[in-house]
C-alpha cells in the first residue's frame, strides 16, 4: 500500500469523527452565510498578544486542529478554528460522487468558489476575533488546502484567478503545495511578510510527489523571516493532529513558538539544530 493510499484511507476514516465534532457559533460572513468556529481563548487573566485564525484542509472542520488551537492560546493568542462550508466534509462528499477520493480532492482544491468562501470565512473570523483581542499581531495558519489558502492570502500568485488583500502580519503553512494544480512556477516571490512552512518526511502530495516538492515555495520566496521545517517521519495527517502524532504535534507547536519568539526578537534566527527536525531560514 502506498503512502497516498494510506493518506486517502485516513481521510475517509475521519469523516465520521468530523461529523460528530461539528458545532455552530453565531458568526455571519459578508454574503449572509453562517460560519462555524471553535474558539481557544488565552488563559484567564493573561494579556492577549494577538489573534490567530486556523484554516483546515479540504474535508476538515472547525472541530479539528485542537492541538494547534490549544498551543496558540497557551502562547496568549485568541485563536479561532474556522469551518469552511464550501470545502468541508459535505462539499468533499459531493465532489467524490462518481469519482475516486483522490479525484474529488483534486476537484475541490482547484475550485475558485471554494476559496472565495474561505476568504469570506477568514475575514469574518478575523473581524470577530479582533473585537475580543484588539492588540498585537494577526496570524493566519492553514493546513493542506488551508495552506494554499494561507499562501494566496500572503500574496502568492495562483492559477485560479484569485486575489485577496494581504491582511495578516504572520503566515504559517502546514503541508504547503509546490507548483502544479494551484500555483505556477515562481508563485511565491511576492510574499513579503514573515512565513513559516512545516512539512514531514512522509508528507506526500496528493499527486504522489514526495514531501520535497513542498520546499519549493520557501526556495522561491525572497529572504526576510522565512523558515522551512521538516519533521522526521511526520505524515500529512499527523500535521492535522491525527494518527500517532504526539511527537509530530510537539515538534510542530515547538517550531511555531520558536518562530514567533525569533520574530519578536527582531532577528528571526532559527534555533539550534535538534534531533528529529531540520529548520532552514533566510
Q: Over which residues does each language-model region extend?
A:
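The feature captures the conserved acid-bearing segment of alpha/beta-hydrolase catalytic domains
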Residues: 163-233
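Active-site rim elements
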Residues: 109-113, 182-183, 239-249
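Alpha/beta-hydrolase active-site loop signature
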Residues: 59, 84-88, 178, 203-204, ...
Amino acid at each position: 500500500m502506498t503512502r497516498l493510499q494510506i493518506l486517502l484511507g485516513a481521510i475517509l476514516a475521519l469523516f465520521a469523527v468530523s461529523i460528530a465534532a461539528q458545532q455552530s457559533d453565531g458568526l455571519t460572513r459578508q454574503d449572509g452565510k453562517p460560519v462555524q468556529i471553535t474558539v481557544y481563548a488565552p488563559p484567564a487573566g493573561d494579556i492577549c498578544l494577538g489573534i490567530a485564525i486556523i484554516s483546515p484542509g479540504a474535508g476538515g472542520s472547525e472541530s479539528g486542529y485542537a492541538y494547534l488551537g490549544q498551543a496558540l492560546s497557551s502562547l496568549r493568542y485568541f485563536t479561532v478554528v474556522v469551518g469552511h462550508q464550501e470545502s468541508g466534509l459535505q462539499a468533499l462528499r459531493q465532489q467524490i460522487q462518481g469519482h475516486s477520493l483522490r479525484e474529488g480532492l483534486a476537484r475541490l482544491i482547484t475550485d475558485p468558489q471554494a476559496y472565495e468562501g474561505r476568504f469570506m470565512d477568514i475575514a469574518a473570523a478575523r473581524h470577530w476575533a479582533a473585537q475580543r483581542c484588539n492588540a498585537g499581531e494577526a496570524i493566519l495558519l492553514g493546513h493542506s488546502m488551508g495552506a494554499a489558502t494561507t499562501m494566496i492570502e500572503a500574496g502568492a500568485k495562483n492559477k485560479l484567478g484569485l486575489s485577496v488583500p494581504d491582511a495578516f502580519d504572520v503566515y504559517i503553512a502546514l503541508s504547503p503545495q509546490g507548483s502544479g494544480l494551484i500555483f505556477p512556477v515562481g508563485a511565491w516571490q511576492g510574499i513579503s511578510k514573515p512565513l513559516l512552512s512545516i512539512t514531514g518526511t512522509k508528507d506526500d502530495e496528493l499527486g504522489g510527489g514526495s514531501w520535497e516538492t513542498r520546499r519549493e515555495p520557501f526556495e522561491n520566496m525572497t529572504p526576510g523571516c522565512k523558515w522551512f521545517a521538516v519533521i522526521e517521519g511526520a505524515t500529512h495527517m499527523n500535521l492535522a493532529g491525527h494518527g500517532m502524532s504526539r511527537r509530530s504535534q510537539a515538534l510542530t507547536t515547538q517550531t511555531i513558538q520558536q518562530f514567533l519568539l525569533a520574530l519578536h526578537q527582531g532577528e528571526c534566527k532559527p534555533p539550534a539544530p535538534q534531533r528529529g527536525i531540520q529548520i532552514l531560514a533566510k
